[in-house]
């Protein structure tokens, strides 16, 4: 048996291994937060597009929510607009919000849609303002309490939190075999735009749709223990203890909280996955061991 035949047999085995998962998840919704290095590396960008198209072709319903922080910062630098942060949160005034919406909706979203369509898929770009898809209000943040003084409210401008997801537009697009690509810009009651963390939008959409899975693509392998080993599965009830003892810290805390909210909202399973790994989405969905950290 020559090498070519052996390689073909291995490919066939991979397909057979994935068959039960294809059958299990057919007609199910999977929400994917697309961000990090996977959005800027050209090879990974194309692999992501092809992976999403494959999901749609085999009957799975993928919904994509994307980030774009580095692209926003690049344009702010070019316009000589100095960003300011409070407790790690970008303060978004009216001028900054214009840039955020311009980049997320007008550039990043269209590039993702264009790539998927170029690769043979049917993608449609949306922002949370379209069809009032993502309704929002201003995020409330408090300064740390000092002594007996009550904590003061911090004005972070047009930074929003999700109040409601109007899922009808997503359901309609999915039924017509389109892949929705969503920019995380929400709309307030007064019609103003709000900048919302993409993880939060993805989590809220997944919960509203009772999605089978929520996958957050990141630039780390997943949640690790204090020894640096990957924690492959976690129950959401374990998260508070891991945060309190310092196992989970920094930017990983809001990500696991998004997963917790999604599970409490009816999502079957959530995942924090290293988007730098080739075909990370397919490995998570269609292999026994998966990749990253599963939170359920």
From Swiss-Prot:
It is found in: Cytoplasm. Gene3D superfamilies: Acetylglutamate kinase-like. InterPro entries: AceGlu_kinase-like_sf, AcgluKinase_fam, ArgB, Asp/Glu/Uridylate_kinase, Glu/AcGlu_kinase, NAGK-C. GO terms for molecular function: acetylglutamate kinase activity; ATP binding. It holds the Pfam family AA_kinase. The record marks 33, 255 as: Transition state stabilizer. Its EC number is 2.7.2.8. It catalyses: N-acetyl-L-glutamate + ATP = N-acetyl-L-glutamyl 5-phosphate + ADP. Belongs to the acetylglutamate kinase family. ArgB subfamily. This is Acetylglutamate kinase.
